[in-house]
Amino acid sequence: MLLPGLLLLLLLLAGTRWLWGQWKLRKLHLPPLAPGFLHFLQPNLPIYLLGLTQKLGPIYRIRLGMQDVVVLNSNRTIEEALIQKWVDFAGRPHMLNGKMDLDLSLGDYSLMWKAHKKLSRSALMLGMRDSMEPLIEQLTQEFCERMRAQAGTPVAIHKEFSFLTCSIISCLTFGDKDSTLVQTLHDCVQDLLQAWNHWSIQILTIIPLLRFLPNPGLQKLKQIQESRDHIVKQQLKQHKDSLVAGQWKDMIDYMLQGVEKQRDGKDEERLHEGHVHMSVVDLFIGGTETTATTLSWAVAFLLHHPEIQKRLQEELDLKLGPGSQLLYRNRMQLPLLMATIAEVLRLRPVVPLALPHRATRASSISGYDIPKDMVIIPNIQGANLDEMVWELPSKFWPDRFLEPGKNPRTPSFGCGARVCLGEPLARLELFVVLARLLQAFTLLPPPDGTLPSLQPQPYAGINLPIPPFQVRLQPRNLAPQDQGERP
């Protein structure tokens, strides 16, 4: 009898809170409300939300469980909220789990959060500035050598990309590319994403009160998080034991010294080892599968468009001779490559639905009132497919970005105060990996000619998952075998 009684009490409290909230909102000029309350069960949510703009306009509300959420579906509304009024919408709602005061991605806006972001960004962009590009180049060359050993054999390229991006982050954070460590980290990230995407976890987004009831899925998620934390704690201990003042070989060294330097600072800005721990976690969770998925989408699109692949290879051959140095600062010398990356990010953004924002104070968007604590969700993919902005928005057409000033910058990594911390790293990885891959290989479908599906799998997590597919990597310094390959 205890469990049903507890559930009834929770429902009564939630209902009372909801009625009180609705009464307070009655005099405000709010965005229109979409009918229904099962919107978040749609298999391709960003596209579904974009479709609602036909009747409701680019900004509207949807009901998520017992609360209303505002959805932004255009560049104009997203930029107004996250750039022009970034302080108003820099907050985060209470999330499902985790060390909220330590988490950079999910933590709420505060002086401590700002200090945490500053240290993490400094570690990535200053601490690893000189070693990041050579490291990515080295690991990409090793990746190409592994792929050359499988030349002509169909390869599940997404798994290879995922291991590569995990190796890069392991080197940046831990200073270690040991294959056993990387495999352990990679498996942990995959387990976390799989657990997070399970319906038993996703339902908590719609009905948060269910988190107080027994939930095997939630217990499994917590167990995986504990395994993840054990790995990170081991690395932190090793780094502390070998730390030398004024020297660093990776991001952990840099951040540990940064924490030590501000030990006597103000309490509201004072960081500690737990912040370093969560910075590492955020980088692995946010930077492994997202970049690997974007690279996989790029390969899939190029398999469907061999004429663009051929033009890219001609550009690379013209600008980069054998053994030439590939430098990101010279990226504008490869305009078609940069345009192709931009087009892949437009059609398949790193995070199609940005993590929810919370209004830190009463504000407005497009003339609509947004009360304090209202949750805002920017539909990045929806904005990238807006027919009012993009010509033939669903078409893969990199040339659209070859005309300067004609197309807006896409917010594929978010924007404003909450822009993805790893954006510079991800853009560098996309540039180096695609350039070296297309220099070394021609991308071909399997012998049966099957092309990958360009329809994302049902969306429930961070990125747009690509259906599994295989690709043959034909070394360009070898003549294609007489098996009907395209040149």
Swiss-Prot record:
Residue numbers binding progesterone: 228
Protein's membrane topology: Peripheral membrane protein
Binding locations of heme b: 92, 117, 357, 418, 420
InterPro entries: Cyt_P450, Cyt_P450_CS, Cyt_P450_E_grp-I, Cyt_P450_sf
Subcellular location, principal: endoplasmic reticulum
Keywords from the UniProt entry: Endoplasmic reticulum, Heme, Iron, Lipid-binding, Membrane, Metal-binding, Microsome, Monooxygenase, Oxidoreductase, Steroid-binding, Steroidogenesis
Positions with a binding annotation for 17alpha-hydroxyprogesterone: 228
UniProt xrefs under Pfam families: p450
Enzyme Commission (EC) number: 1.14.14.16
Gene3D superfamilies found in the cross-reference section: Cytochrome P450
Cofactor(s) needed by this chain: heme b
GO biological process, one term: steroid metabolic process
GO-annotated cellular components: endoplasmic reticulum membrane
Keyword Glycoprotein part of the UniProt annotation: no
Subcellular locations according to the entry: Endoplasmic reticulum membrane; Microsome membrane
GO molecular function term, any single one: 17-hydroxyprogesterone 21-hydroxylase activity
Catalytic activity, as annotated: progesterone + reduced [NADPH--hemoprotein reductase] + O2 = 21-hydroxyprogesterone + oxidized [NADPH--hemoprotein reductase] + H2O + H(+); 17alpha-hydroxyprogesterone + reduced [NADPH--hemoprotein reductase] + O2 = 11-deoxycortisol + oxidized [NADPH--hemoprotein reductase] + H2O + H(+)
Stated family: Belongs to the cytochrome P450 family.
Entry-linked PANTHER family: STEROID 17-ALPHA-HYDROXYLASE/17,20 LYASE (PTHR24289), STEROID 21-HYDROXYLASE ISOFORM X1 (PTHR24289:SF17)
Protein purpose: A cytochrome P450 monooxygenase that plays a major role in adrenal steroidogenesis. Mechanistically, uses molecular oxygen inserting one oxygen atom into a substrate, and reducing the second into a water molecule, with two electrons provided by NADPH via cytochrome P450 reductase (CPR; NADPH-ferrihemoprotein reductase).
Domains as described in the record: The leucine-rich hydrophobic amino acid N-terminal region probably helps to anchor the protein to the microsomal membrane.
Protein name: Steroid 21-hydroxylase
Species per Swiss-Prot/TrEMBL record: Mus musculus (Mouse)
